[in-house]
Amino acid sequence: MNSNTHAKSSNFHQSELDKFAALANRWWDADGPQKPLHALNPVRLEYVSARLEPAGARVLDVGCGGGLLSESMARLGAQVTAIDLAPELVKVARLHSLESGVQVDYRVQSVEDLAAEQAGSFDAVTCMEMLEHVPDPTAIIRACASLLKPGGKLFLSTLNRTPAAFALAVVGAEYIARLLPKGTHHYKDFIKPAELAAWLRNAGLQLEDVSGMLYEPWRNRARLSSRTEVNYLAYAVKP
């Protein structure tokens, strides 16, 4: 199935969808191509849970992939809707949900289309490791802001555009250690925190925090850090 079969939005690179769709069958393999993502997921969940009471919260996971974060939040009691434009990934996410018994409402849908249908519906929106893979990340942020209730919270993670990020996330992870498939990242699409802060302000959101996320490949572990040169998380609130 072509990855854009159900996609109305044009805010995606077909090559990016195809690249991640090809990893679908091993998405939940902790030792597979998404091994670093499995290491990052507990840290992402820790960051969100420290700022949001998950139990009973309506949460949207944008760019959910195979559902790692979606299921994790649902296990904590959140009512999770999760969207992705790759049908192959959503299929894997749904199958894993059936196996685990964790309920998540998975959809093949763009965040822009969902915003047109359900503005102001969610207590929190998460958008992790996605902004650097789309043509117009500002449109994603605007749609996320629209979907939040007043007082709602947006959680983001992405890669900083620094020499350190190029050395570690591209050269090191993809070509030397081979932790990720070659071509996973494009350095020119990485996002500086100051750029992200401006996009959030323009979307009417208040940036509350930026924290580094440090991945230690020799231990296959990740942790929060004050250093934002490579991976970082951000948290913003809708007034």
From Swiss-Prot:
SUPFAM superfamilies reported in the protein's UniProt record: S-adenosyl-L-methionine-dependent methyltransferases (SSF53335)
Protein name in the entry: Ubiquinone biosynthesis O-methyltransferase
Enzyme class: transferase
Record Pfam families: Methyltransf_23
Catalytic reaction list: a 3-demethylubiquinol + S-adenosyl-L-methionine = a ubiquinol + S-adenosyl-L-homocysteine + H(+); a 3-(all-trans-polyprenyl)benzene-1,2-diol + S-adenosyl-L-methionine = a 2-methoxy-6-(all-trans-polyprenyl)phenol + S-adenosyl-L-homocysteine + H(+)
UniProt family annotation: Belongs to the methyltransferase superfamily. UbiG/COQ3 family.
Molecular function via GO: 2-polyprenyl-6-hydroxyphenol methylase activity; 3-demethylubiquinol 3-O-methyltransferase activity; polyprenyldihydroxybenzoate methyltransferase activity
Residues reported in the UniProt entry to bind S-adenosyl-L-methionine: R44, G63, D84, M128
EC nos: 2.1.1.222, 2.1.1.64
Chain's role: O-methyltransferase that catalyzes the 2 O-methylation steps in the ubiquinone biosynthetic pathway.
Keyword terms of this UniProt record: Methyltransferase, S-adenosyl-L-methionine, Transferase, Ubiquinone biosynthesis
Single biological process term from Gene Ontology: methylation
Pathway: Cofactor biosynthesis; ubiquinone biosynthesis
